[in-house]
Amino acid sequence: MGRNREFDIDQALEAALCVFWKKGYEGTSYTDLTQATGVERPALYSAFGNKEALFLRVLDRYYNHYHDFFPAALELPTSREVVARIFRGAAELQTRYPDHKGCLYVHGDLAGSDDAEPIRRALVNARAEGETSLRERFERAKQEGDLPENANSSVLAAFVMAVLHGMAVQAKAGFSRNMLEAVAEQALSTWPTGSSAQSGKSS
């Protein structure tokens, strides 16, 4: 019985992540998962619990291993640099793998059944956390003079998230990295600047 657990947990999570990334939560069957991981269903149950629990583990892995550019970008000195880095990171990630393009945060919950509600809620919460961290970063940018005093940090954060969502959808539809980066540059062309940013340009 114990031999059913003799597989590499990390490799199994990575394989499951790729399947969920490609097919979404409800589009992924246990057959898909067992074929991708090479692990029988009882062993998957034993190691991870049910499909929902496995997806939540995958979501953590996705953030830590693939979405790490997002928290790193928040440390950059100006809000424009923050957003530019996030857009570049998203464009690269969303087109990195031909077999599973787009973003797990966006495509993971494209489903309608009540059974998927906990997954939708987890993904909504993950996106909300990202938006909150952006809003807080933009508030700091206002205090530093990097953004205008009348800039609406909540609207700017929502704008960035909306662009990211659109990029993910377009990547899934086949847009190239170059096209996504061009879209990002267009979005950045409207980015507001505060007194400190303007004085830096003139000096």
Regions from the PLM with identified roles:
Residues D8-L17, L33, V58-Y62, Y66, ...:
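Generic hydrophobic, amphipathic alpha-helix propensity
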Residues E117-Q143, V155, A182:
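Amphipathic alpha-helical packing segments from all-alpha helical-bundle domains
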Residues L93-R96, R140, V160-R177, T190-Q198:
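Amphipathic C-terminal alpha-helical segment
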Residues R57, P71-K101, S153-V160:
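Hydrophobic alpha-helical connector segments
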